[in-house]
């Protein structure tokens, strides 16, 4: 949810390259960003060793501007002509994207609201083309059945029923996620009529992004894939349980969401989802 900030900075400083502090998993998402500079990896698993190494590398450079949207102390250790942190933002902003953008708007009063974006490379686009050639679909439904916690995962039985009830609107369904999501995806595909492509555990993040760019609709739990789908331009419907959609829902004009009663994702019924999709004109 930080890419709108990158786009704002690029508009203000079109000739600048932007160094970024990233974690191991998100690093690949920025490799093909056309205005990126150096990527500094933050090792969350080895904090005591990794943080001093990160600080040492950053301290060797001097910046015109340093922006920190997440931590409280890293800016103190970076040499920069100007520094902006969370305290420069609008405390009343609700969504994380709006809060992040409010930090850098102090630079030029820019009121533009950029969408999140992704930069898949040529190899990622070719991979997506090869995979989707298997289903030869004009209208693809993408499903992400997993999440990073069991309490965020909608029942595979509900996903299966939902797909069967809306399958007239699609030619195929592609399932995306990690390798641990694959058994759930197999349960779903075992009982559906649509031609299915189970790619759980078979893609990198950018390969998944390239596939999501072809989706006619994305439906998934509260996970990173929902944010990627919205950034790729797909209409999205995210199912929330204990999360905070007002702060962390996918960002985009065609991104909708539902929250289960009492913050329980499995209190969302299939009927609830279909009504919500129809209300938001995401079904034909």
Regions found by a protein language model. Give the residues of each.
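Catalytic machinery of carbohydrate-active enzymes
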Residues: 1-284
């Amino acid at each position: 949810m930080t890419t709108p900030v990158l786009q704002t900075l690029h508009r203000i400083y079109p000739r600048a390259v932007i160094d970024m502090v990233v974690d191991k998993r998100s690093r690949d998402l920025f490799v093909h960003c056309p205005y990126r500079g150096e990527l500094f990896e933050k090792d969350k698993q080895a904090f005591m060793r990794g943080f001093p190494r990160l600080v040492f590398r950053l301290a060797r450079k001097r910046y015109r501007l340093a922006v920190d949207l997440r931590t409280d102390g890293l800016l103190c250790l970076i040499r920069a002509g100007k520094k902006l942190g969370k305290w420069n933002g609008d405390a009343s902003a609700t969504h994380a994207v709006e809060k992040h953008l409010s930090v850098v708007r102090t630079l030029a009063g820019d009121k533009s609201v950029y969408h999140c974006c992704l930069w898949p490379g040529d190899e990622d686009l070719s991979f997506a083309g090869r995979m989707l050639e298997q289903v030869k679909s004009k209208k693809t439904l993408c499903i992400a059945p997993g999440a990073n916690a069991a309490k965020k995962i909608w029942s595979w039985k509900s996903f299966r029923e939902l797909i069967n009830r809306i399958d007239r609107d699609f030619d195929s369904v592609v399932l995306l996620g990690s390798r641990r999501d694959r058994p759930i995806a197999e349960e779903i595909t075992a009982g559906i009529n649509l031609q299915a492509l189970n790619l759980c555990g078979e893609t990198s993040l950018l390969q998944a992004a390239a596939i999501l760019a072809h989706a006619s609709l994305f439906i998934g739990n509260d996970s990173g894939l929902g944010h990627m789908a919205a950034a790729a331009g797909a209409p999205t419907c995210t199912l929330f349980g204990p999360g905070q959609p007002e702060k962390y829902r996918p960002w985009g004009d065609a991104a909708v969401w539902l929250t289960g009663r009492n913050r329980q994702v499995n209190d969302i019924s299939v009927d609830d989802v279909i009504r919500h999709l129809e209300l938001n004109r995401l079904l034909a």
